[in-house]
Amino acid sequence: CCGRNTTILSEMSGYSDRFFFYTMDETDIITSRHLQKIPRAIREICESSEKEPSVVMVCMTCVDALLGTDMEHVCRKAANEVGLPVVPCYMYALTREGRKPPMVAVRQAVYSLLKSRKRRGDAVNLLGYFSPLQDDCELYDLLKQAGVKHIREISRCGDFDEYLAMSEANFNLVLHPESRLAAQDMEERLQIPSIELTRMYDTEKIHKQYGIFSKVMGASLDDRPYKEEAQATVEEFLKKYGPIRVAIGEMMNGDAFDMAAALSKYGLDVREIYGTVTAESFVRLRQLAETNGSIKVYSNLSPTMLYYADDETVDLAIGKDAAYYHPKAAHVFWNQEIQPFGHRGVTTLFREMTRAMEGHSI
């Protein structure tokens, strides 16, 4: 599964020439002889590449987790062999339900090469996603209002030197929970503190969060124009289509339960949610129970979804999973690489919803 997905995604994105696979057999697993070959393989790859890489990342799967492989030692040996940084990355699906699931481990590994530098008071890092926020996101403007001149995201770094400059940040802004551990690691190693902002789709909650952030920053941040624009887009949609029936899935850019609570508050009729219920989800579920207790919640992980019957009339499905369950509804996949955030995220969402209702599949 890991190899298949990596191959497909790397080919689609045009960087398949940067990925290499070591095929293990039973003898490798029993004798661990593959560990001796990894440093040599890395050297051969670096020597055969047209352009020498800046860093090499060695990704391990569950096999090495079960073997108890000391991949830190293997990577140190490889680094000495090629004279380049070699970083281990643990892609262990076995840890998915634990404290350090794969995507948390990957984020920590990605920032592990940053070294201590003199910090700049006008620099900040945005941690959370492997792709950038939408260009018109108000967060960039609000940070500039606070005097920030250098806003860095790993996905916008043009080269390795720009990546290393992330060590100069005065603080990190954590935009996704899976980056908390990476931020904690950077605070311990580089003394860069962090502030967390949550992606939400309720304009009032977004405004309140920015208000708290404004106090922490000690600056006056004005998000009102963006809030008013988002609210106007919501009102325009409701005026045109009314309280349509909506199904919301988890395969999209957002939390299904947060989005359901926000859309219900706006006046839409949320009928179904497809998502994994966590401790954080119950906060939104309690809100939904008070306003719309008839919402059905399904788990995509449950085998019983094989028997799911599309007997609920839905006008609009948000998320690729919800679209699968409701093929006749208007669809907004909302899983684009560029990440929506804040008021502009709400504005963009409702514009996409409008386009979908007009007959276009987004």
Model-derived features with residue positions:
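An N-terminal assembly and electron-transfer interface module characteristic of large anaerobic redox
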Residues: 1-362
